[in-house]
């Protein structure tokens, strides 16, 4: 089979017009020959409407065009291989006319490798029936892949740079999908479905948003920190349907898993920090201790989606996120991190509690035992209270005595022993301690109860 190759220059790129690009593209379509373009600069807009206009009056023996009620489908029945090309205008393979839309269907493999798109790129409602490769490609303006179907075995965006917004709304990825070593500015995945393996390894971003998305097979996320990148990630109502899901180096202070079940997700490199959803909830509630810098960042990055996203946050949903995260971390046997999350979960409950008494009780629980997470802290409270009660008991029992060292030691020892008896709920026959007895008993119940919770929690995690 003869393959038409457009090769523009060897040492430096030659400039061609978008009209020449379209002429050669249509020529390949008519002849059924693969289209190759290499080492060129294309000036002007590339528009599927111009391709449609050139072939609509020709015989449709190749099945290039299908007309439906409200759309015109341009079938690209050839392989497309474009390498090291710079497009200086918009690249539109979707056009919305007054009464009809023009969409594209790539029936062969589509390779756009080492490309620079200087204008906006539109692959809206496009169908890729073969493999797709955008490796090492730069999108300098917005890129739209909404309502797009990637049906091939391989979808590769590795090494790609999205300098502005990238939209993947209601997009379907059927084959193995690679976004490895990819740089996003603002990436929005909304109502998208990933049916096979997905790799978001070594990525960097300002905002990465997954809303109402579904991952049916295993998926791995690994973020790398870059200077001047905010690294905010939002997983809202996202479904991870495979147990082999790994999320690495996504700091909880910059990541929200609101209404997302992560109980069986492996979260790596979790540090002690307040989760992003807790901070956003403060912004929504307009509390006095909200993070104003974060609020401004979210407004800037989310744009028109800001109100919709922010309205999803409420006390119960954020509390559920804390608990899901804690269960996930406990399942991965990283108990120290799980303990830290539980403390912050209790801080959330205290912060949004309505009653002063409830806030006091929760605060006391935290002060005594770190919400049942610290045996050491509770032990210090027990020791300190017993010393204090021994002093008070000695004062109540004092009726005068000889200043003999052994008598003094004996006196203090008896006081200490009486306090221990009361602390262990055994009781005392010393009537002089009747005032102190109920105080010691109540304190004992509180402190020993906290110690029991801390010990049980520690043993359950062994």
UniProtKB/Swiss-Prot annotation:
The chain crosses the membrane at residues 381-401, 433-453. It is found in: Cell membrane. It is a multi-pass membrane protein. Keywords: Cell membrane, Membrane, Transmembrane, Transmembrane helix. The keyword Protein biosynthesis does not apply. Its main location: membrane. GO terms for cellular component: plasma membrane. InterPro entries: 5peptide_repeat. This is Uncharacterized protein MJ1147.
């Amino acid at each position: 089979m003869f393959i038409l190759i457009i090769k523009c220059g060897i040492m430096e790129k030659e400039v061609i017009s978008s009209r020449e690009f379209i002429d050669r593209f249509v020529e390949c379509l008519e002849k059924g020959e693969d289209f190759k373009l290499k080492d060129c600069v294309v000036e002007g807009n590339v528009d599927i409407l111009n391709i449609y206009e050139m072939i609509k009056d020709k015989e449709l023996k190749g099945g290039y065009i299908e007309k439906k009620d409200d759309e015109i489908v341009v079938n690209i029945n050839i392989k497309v291989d474009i390498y090291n090309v710079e497009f200086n205008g918009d690249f539109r393979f979707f056009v919305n006319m007054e009464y009809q839309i023009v969409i594209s269907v790539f029936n062969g493999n589509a390779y756009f490798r080492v490309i620079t798109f200087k204008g906006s790129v539109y692959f809206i409602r496009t169908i890729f029936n073969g493999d797709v490769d955008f490796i090492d490609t730069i999108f300098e303006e917005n890129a739209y892949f909404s309502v797009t179907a990637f049906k091939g075995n391989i979808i590769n965006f590795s090494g790609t740079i999205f300098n502005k917004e990238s939209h993947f709304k209601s997009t379907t990825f059927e084959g193995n999908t690679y976004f490895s070593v990819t740089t996003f500015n603002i990436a929005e995945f909304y109502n998208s479905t990933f049916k096979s393996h997905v790799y978001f390894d070594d990525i960097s971003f300002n905002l990465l948003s997954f809303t109402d998305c579904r991952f049916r097979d295993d998926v791995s996320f690994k973020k790398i920190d870059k200077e001047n990148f905010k690294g905010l990630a939002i997983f809202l109502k996202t479904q991870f349907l495979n147990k082999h899901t790994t999320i690495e180096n996504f700091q909880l202070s910059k990541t929200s898993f609101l209404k997302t079940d992560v109980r069986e997700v492996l979260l790596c490199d979790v540090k002690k920090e307040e989760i992003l959803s807790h901070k956003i909830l403060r912004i929504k509630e307009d509390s006095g201790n909200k993070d104003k810098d974060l609020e401004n960042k979210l407004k800037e990055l989310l744009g028109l989606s800001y109100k919709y996203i922010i309205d999803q946050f409420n006390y119960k949903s954020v509390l559920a996120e804390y608990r899901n995260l804690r269960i996930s971390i406990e399942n991965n046997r990283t108990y120290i991190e799980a303990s830290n999350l539980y403390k912050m979960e209790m801080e959330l409950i205290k912060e949004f509690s309505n009653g002063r008494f409830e806030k006091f009780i929760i605060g006391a629980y935290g002060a005594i035992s770190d919400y049942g997470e610290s045996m050491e802290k509770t032990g210090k409270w027990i020791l300190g209270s017993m010393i204090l009660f021994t002093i008070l008991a000695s004062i109540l029992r004092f009726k005068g005595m000889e200043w003999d060292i052994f008598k003094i030691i004996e006196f203090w020892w008896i006081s200490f022993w009486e306090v221990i008896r009361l602390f262990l709920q055994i009781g005392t026959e010393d009537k002089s301690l009747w005032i102190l007895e109920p105080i010691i008993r109540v304190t004992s119940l509180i402190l020993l109860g906290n110690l029991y919770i801390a010990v049980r929690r520690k043993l359950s995690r062994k």
